[in-house]
């Protein structure tokens, strides 16, 4: 209001107007200064807010950093405590050595390192399927030399925690001069240890002896396995005996496995089997015990017992129930067991499939067995092309055991392909190789080789030699009894043949082979109904075994029931599609049942496949293609 009045008066009076103008200029200047001050205050406030925000951020970051450091420190301490509590390794302390040796560079740390090298070598040379976790005192590959620290350090803290919470094995020792040379002692923990003495130049030998003493003290089962592998069976047996008295339950069960291996080396398969049954009584889920039992029974040609042990091994392996098996070996072992089961029941196509899977896995002493199994299985499938392809794919080997295995399986394949002269040539080279095995030779000759050599001789009409060989075979050998029956059948000695087959089936009632052979004998005799009855039983036990189906079809055809025989031949073809005789007889059945065009297809297929000389003559009679 006052400003308005002054401005109104200024209009009437020039002097007043001049004063008013001066007043307005002063007010404008004041307002401009106030505006500038307010702008500066605003800028200062914004800068202050930025500083406060940055300060808050830095405060939070600092607090987070502190928290992170605390968490990391706690985690590190926790990890150190956990590692210490689970430490089962070996720590080798620097040895006490004479000053003159140290002056030459053989310090306590150098000697400790030499001992470490020897222990690592012993471990590497010990081949066992046993899992490290099953040892009461396992240090595996965790072996290290302790280098002393000065002052307080993280290393000292870790050592303190491991000593307080862990289960590590500490090895100490000393070397000193004697009148005759040197004396070396190495001890694990508080255990006493022998002292080894020798000449000045025998230090490496003395350290090796000390390392073995430590290995025996800390890893007795592994050391026994090492000894067995280095032709020191008597020393190994002593350790196994000590484990049976003082060892853990796992050690006792595995000690019996070690004793089984020693029994086999002496050729005592029955004794080895008894050791394995003792192992199983202690540890019923010990997979390797059942697998070794199956192998022992197989070597003895105890088909029924082998089948039972193999089934039990598969059940344990598939359930993962054996913590004692080295985990890396388990997948291969399960496949091997399944291949064995398939073979025991006549499912040779499945056996080859399992072998192929094994061949795709890392070699755990498993590839050669798979290769050899393929050869035999291809032969039993009457598939000459499969045998040849498998044989050509074999990698070269100079190992005598590999030579025996491959030659024996080629002999078996040629036997089923009816290549009698080739089988005899292969078979004649096997006995000298087997005899080189030492005490085991007698078992393999009388139970695995003589029966097949006898059957080959019979098919070459050398019955005198056939009987001389087969008479050397034992009465509890199932394949021996079966081949006795087949040799007698070839001479039309029907009652004697039936006697042997009856005994074979009684010893192995769950496998299909005895009744298959029995049915074949009855087919040769012309008793078709009885043959069909035996072959039906064989098929029930081995539903994927082609031989009883093919013979069943032949029996029906010879009974003038070609209409029924067709189904048997078709089913047999599912399991042995490259069997020349099968396609020949299938074609004959089609021809007799009024299907000449279909018969020609089977005859043409037979002509492409392996046929015996007799079957090839028969093919020419029925087909002129």
PLM regions with names:
Residues 2-79, 179-180, 187-274:
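C-terminal/domain-edge helix-coil "capping" segments
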Residues 85-181, 189:
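Short beta-strand->alpha-helix linker/helix-N-cap micro-motif
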Residues 218, 254, 288, 326, ...:
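Start-of-helix register in tetratricopeptide repeats
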Residues 225, 261, 295, 340, ...:
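Residue-level recognition of tetratricopeptide repeat
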Residues 229, 265, 299, 344, ...:
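Register position in tetratricopeptide repeats
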Residues 236, 272, 306, 351, ...:
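Single-residue signature of alpha-solenoid repeat helices
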Residues 246-248, 282, 316, 361, ...:
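Structural marker of alpha-solenoid helical repeat scaffolds
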Residues 258, 292, 337, 409, ...:
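Canonical tetratricopeptide repeat
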